[in-house]
Amino acid sequence: MPYSEIEAKFLGPGKELTREPCYKKLKSAVDDGVFPHRGGPDSHRIQEKTKNNRLPVATINFRRRVCPGEDKTSTDVLKPLHKEMPGDKVGGTESIGSQALQDGKPLAPARDDEIYSTSKAFIGPIYKPPEKKKCRERKNETATFNNTDSKRRQEEKQKFNSKKLEIDTELSQFYKEIEELENENEASQGSCKEPEPSQEQTLSHDQACNTLKPEGESKDLSTVLQSHCGYQPYLEDESDYPCDEQLIPAFCDTSFPSFRPEWQSVHPFVIPHDPLPSFNYFNIQRFGAPLHPPPSVFHARDDARLQSGCYIDSYQDGWSCLTLDQNDEYANYDVPGNVHPFGNGYGVQDDSVKNGFCEIRECWQDPSMDMHNEADRFVNQCFQEDRLNKLQKLLILLRGLPGSGKTTLSRILLGQSRDGIVFSTDDYFHHQDGYRYNVNQLGDAHDWNQNRAKQAIDQGRSPVIIDNTNTQAWEMKPYVEMAIGKGYRVEFHEPETWWKFDPEELEKRNKHGVSRKKIAQMLDRYEFQMSISIVMNSVEPTQKSTQTPLPLQGDQRWGGSLGSHSQVSITDDY
């Protein structure tokens, strides 16, 4: 310890000096052989033996450093004592102290087994603990790690920026290539321009190729091609009605000037040279107007309705050119995959012209876009057809044997529209006192029902539902003619019941007692395939066989002509 106090006591002859800590002297104020403490904490008291058991006391100040000019009187006093007791340990101690004083150097601290010392100063480590060094090392390591991490992040950020720049460059190059391809396509499309013929010009079927204008120009339809027709169809006069970029052809004779509607055109329709398609039951059928209408045909009235994209406002009773021999090929026909159904029941193809129909198509130069354009054309055509169907008036012809469920079906269809109406030839035989059938009145009953339907069509009622058996096509021809003349759309509907062709079940379900035998005869004459073309090409039989009326009232009404028995349809229910 750097600072200590030593107190010496004489214990008697032959005893060694003992050292006590300074704190012991505080306990007793008077102690034998102990002098009052003089000096600071650095002073030591030394007691030596003498002849009278008294020791001279020399006060020695132990300091770490002793000034050279310090007073050395104490050293001179101690020298004789050293000579008298050379072997004494106290003398050794005195000699050591004297030597230390002479040299001016601090006295070395006594050993632990001889001197007990205490310190009033704080006992603790002189130097900083090693933990601080470790903390500094950790801080240095953390700083080094942070610097390394920041450098690594900067490198990653630079790599990411370089990759992003490469991707942006590739994208810009890709967009440039796409733009170049689009410009090339536009340039190739610009080579085909749509001709604009005059209003008085007529085109034959071999000149029927319309071209598509480039993008940016107007897409208005500039020409409608005319053709010579193999037979006299109805003429569809057109008016200015927008059809959402749908190409609508018109069929007319070359003796009339071409019409130029104002709606826009995008997709082509090509008229087929193959036979017309056949349709079944619920398929929608449309037909054109006669070729030579009265002069009023060219003035579209307000009640004219849009038929297959064109306004139809004409009607003519004469169908002299239509014979079964010429057009019976239309009876059975399946629509091929590349034929698009047209609005009036005809299909369209990309081949040459036949049967007096002209070909209308776009001039498309890029074969890589054919598939995409074909899909767009089909979707656009379906959407346009649905839109036209909603705008047009509707004539529904129900077909089915007695008891098959026609009346129930008519009620369902009638409930879907507020302005609809149902007509049945069988209503003629309903009286206030009940139902009375008279075969001699069968012709009058048909005329009466047709007149009612015509009045409803003239008034614009829709849908007009004809609830007759309509087993054969010629029975429906008067209704189809008057409907097409007023721009109505024509549909054929049959009840979808499992017993509709089962004579035994039909006998049980019909309300007027029609026998199973009569129902079987009607089923033998039933024409399953039905379409507009079949109806318009049908002819009423010239030879009519008569039958003797049966006694039963339910069978008596079937005793008329072969042709009329199917038209006198009973309002059946199930």
UniProtKB/Swiss-Prot annotation:
Pfam families named among the record's database cross-references: AAA_33
Keyword Coiled coil tagged: yes
Regions that span the bilayer: none
Alphabetic keyword roster: Coiled coil
Name of encoding gene: N4bp2l2
GO biological process, one term: negative regulation of hematopoietic stem cell differentiation
Polar residues: compositionally biased ranges: 563-574
Region of interest (Disordered), ranges: 82-110, 127-161, 182-204, 542-574
GO cellular component, one term: nucleus
Name the record gives this protein: NEDD4-binding protein 2-like 2
Claim: Coiled coil is one of the keywords in the record: yes
InterPro entries per record: NEDD4-bd_p2, P-loop_NTPase
Species classification: Eukaryota, Metazoa, Chordata, Craniata, Vertebrata
GO molecular function: enzyme binding; transcription corepressor activity
Chain segments annotated as coiled-coil in the UniProt record: 162-196
Biased composition (Basic and acidic residues): 129-141, 149-161
SUPFAM superfamilies recorded: P-loop containing nucleoside triphosphate hydrolases
